[in-house]
UniProtKB/Swiss-Prot annotation:
GO cellular component, one term: cytoplasm
HAMAP family per UniProt: PelO
EC number: 3.1.-.-
Protein name: Protein pelota homolog
Signal sequence extent: none
Gene designation per UniProt: pelA
Location of this chain's protein in the cell: Cytoplasm
InterPro entries tied to this protein: eFR1_2_sf, eRF1_1_Pelota, eRF1_2, eRF1_3, Pelota/DOM34_N, Pelota_arc, Ribosomal_eL30-like_sf, Transl-rel_pelota
Classification of source organism: Archaea, Thermoproteota, Thermoprotei, Desulfurococcales, Desulfurococcaceae
Physiological role: May function in recognizing stalled ribosomes, interact with stem-loop structures in stalled mRNA molecules, and effect endonucleolytic cleavage of the mRNA. May play a role in the release non-functional ribosomes and degradation of damaged mRNAs. Has endoribonuclease activity.
Annotated family: Belongs to the eukaryotic release factor 1 family. Pelota subfamily.
Recorded GO MF terms: endonuclease activity; metal ion binding
Class of enzymatic activity (EC top level): hydrolase
Length: 356
């Protein structure tokens, strides 16, 4: 989750949803009476006798109900339209906005409780993604954080024409070496989680090889029409950024699963798995880290699904690290083998201490 704008004096917070975990945080934070603004579409009839058509628009809803849409990764927010385009006469009518990963929404509430703000703050993950856009003219280096994009530097190539072949190759090698050195410095200084290198030609591949060799970081390559800082702007609009954020959650989940598997053999009182066992642990505020397979959120049994929701709510309330992964991913399938949810505990719980 990224907080794009905050004005608590006027009760206003604007948020970017980065992964499914964020949808669950919003599910717990949103409440009846909130005003939510988001881009949506609505079927309207422009004039007398005309055929209706679906038109994109930004609407403000007074929230009446919030739910997860079955079998999709969307949060459905239903309410009465309080603000929207006057020409379509939508005010006062009911509407449902579906929020998914990559969407933005603004929430307006008269007074934000400390509890709600704490939950939102826990959802802001401190991810740092290094962005590089390179071509034969220049390379731009920037870091994407929750606060936005911070530009570090732009390096010019100063390449001579290709008619000076030997000199061209030497200066090209120096250029790549200079960019790689600058990247390695930023990686060390900024505690980077992943690197995205983009550009129109083959230079991104050569640079990517250098960075992979020098660092144990996840390096992603993508194609943009230009390099330099203009290429960074183009890169931010591409799906690869969303993919990287999702992959980082998978990497974190794998770390928790490996720790869980190690502890279940060496110290089984420090883990819990399965809905009932994890629920018992979370009630005691014993859960430190928890991984949930996404399929469990769509459990057809109402009572069992409600128990899963309780686990998530109590985990967030007690400061546990919560990671939700796709059920069909490798790590998701592994978690499903343990009942769909696993937890690493803060302290030992002997099974007689809590009833399933």
């Amino acid at each position: 989750m990224r907080v794009l704008e905050e004005d608590l004096r006027n009760g206003y917070i604007r948020i970017l949803v980065e992964d499914i975990d964020d949808l669950w945080i919003l599910f717990m934070v949103l409440r009846k009476g909130d005003i939510v603004y988001a881009r949506t579409s609505r079927e309207v009839k422009p004039g007398e006798g005309g055929s209706s058509r679906r038109i994109p628009m930004v609407l403000g809803l007074r929230v009446e109900a919030i739910e997860f849409q079955e079998f999709t990764e969307k949060l459905r927010i239903r309410g009465i339209v309080v603000e929207g385009p006057e020409e379509f006469g939508v005010k006062g009518h009911y509407h449902t906005i579906a929020i998914g990963v990559g969407d933005q929404l603004a929430i307006v509430r008269e007074t934000w409780s400390k509890h709600s703000l704490d939950i939102l703050k826990k959802g802001v993950r401190r991810r740092r993604i290094l962005l590089v856009s390179i071509d034969y003219d220049s390379a731009c280096i920037a870091v994407l954080t929750e606060q936005g994009v911070k530009h570090h530097s732009e390096i010019q190539s100063d390449l001579p024409g290709k008619m000076y072949r030997v000199e061209h190759e030497e200066i090209l090698d120096e250029y790549l070496s200079k960019v790689a050195s600058a990247l390695n410095n930023v990686i060390q200084q900024e505690e980077i989680d992943a690197v995205i290198i983009a550009g129109p030609g083959d230079l991104k591949n050569k640079l990517g090889e250098n960075i992979r060799r020098d660092n144990r970081k996840h390096v992603y390559l993508d194609t943009t029409s230009t390099g330099g800082c203009q290429g960074i702007s183009e890169l931010l609009g591409r799906d690869v950024v969303k993919q990287v954020v999702g992959d980082l959650s998978i990497v974190k989940a794998k770390e928790v699963v490996e720790e869980f598997k190690r502890l279940i053999i060496k110290d089984p009182q420090l883990v819990a798995y399965g809905v009932d066992d994890v629920y018992g642990a979370v009630v005691y505020a014993a859960v430190s880290r928890i991984v949930v397979a996404g399929d469990l959120l769509h459990e057809p049994d109402d009572e069992r699904r409600a128990r899963v929701y309780e686990i998530l709510e109590k985990a967030y309330e007690t400061g546990a690290e919560v990671i939700i992964v796709p059920g069909k991913s490798d790590v998701g399938l592994e978690v499903q083998g343990f009942g769909g949810v696993i937890a690493v505990l803060r302290y030992r719980l002997f099974r007689g201490e809590h009833s399933p």
